[in-house]
Amino acid sequence: QMCIRDREYRDIITDSGHYAALVRLGDKAIAMSTDGVGSKILIAEMMNKYNTVGIDCIAMVVNDILCVGAEPIALVDYLAVEQPDPERAEEIAEGLVTGAKESRISIIGGETASLPGIIKDFDLAGTGIGFVDVDKIITGEDIEAGDVLIGIESNGIHSNGYSLARKALFDDAGFSIDDKMPNCDTTIGEELIRPTELYVKPIVALFKEEYEIHGLAHITGGGFTNLRRLKKGVGYNIYDLPEAPEIFKLIYQQNVPLEEMYKVFNMGVGFVVITSENEAEKIMKTLKEYCNCQIIGKVTDDEKITVKTFEGSEVTY
């Protein structure tokens, strides 16, 4: 990835590779992040259901902006299509509006491009901005051994790992989107299309309380190895995850190794708040007004990430 960072003209605060870039504007900083829905779009096409991928687009961007302590405020979207399809575009827009309202942001512009011969079907991405006071930026540099990890539950796969999920469930196992999930009242398709959880309300509530937060992580592609984006020189012992959603167990049953599962998927935790042990209970009390959360582990000083799996074994990265 090429990243041009000329500090002669702009005061850039974060290093490349963090969840969002920060540029200082006086005593404020603007946070910027861009992301897309990825191959989850193929599930939408299989189901002929397009009114939720816009929520995924919003979520992938705003959840990343939160990770530097910024409150998301606005987004522009980019829809690239093989051929114009007004009905599909209207469904996609419906999801974008839903996600924007839930995140309390404005969609201030966008672009729709028809690219026959370049793109197949469609692709959807967004770029968002947020603001934060410079003295309230959270980069992860304050993380230290002994800190606790508070995990906020996911509602399923979110928007990462769909290449592996499709291979395991459809190519290898031969399931269809209409097959019933084990131990659930939903189909496989319904579980796969479920929109990504939006974490704006609970995390912004923490910002307003001005709790001592050392790090924030959106658990996306890469699973818990995303924690390495926050600070070098520390590790994480994750020993008490919530029950993994059934969709992950079904994928695992198709001979996907646990080491790969926990490196690709969120495995039931979509967002992590890192704080001191003394602050954890207060933070969880606020979070529980919005979502399910629990202490899932601690920060260590050995640079390894160790995760206790739902089978009781451990995987290390």
Residue ranges and their predicted role:
Residues 137-184, 188:
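Short, acidic (Asp/Glu-rich) active-site segment that either coordinates a divalent metal cofactor
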Residues 2-4, 273:
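Short, small-residue-biased leader/transition segments that mark boundaries at the very start
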Residues 5-8, 255-256:
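Short Pro/Gly-enriched beta-strand edge/turn motifs at strand-loop
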Residues 53, 160, 195-198:
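A generic structural signal for residues located within well-ordered alpha-helices
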Residues 8-155:
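Glycine-rich phosphate/pyrophosphate-binding loop regions near the starts of catalytic domains
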Residues 88-106, 119-122, 176, 182-193, ...:
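Glycine-/charge-enriched secondary-structure boundary and capping motifs
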Residues 41-42, 159-161, 227:
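Short helix/loop capping segments that flank catalytic or ligand/cofactor-binding pockets
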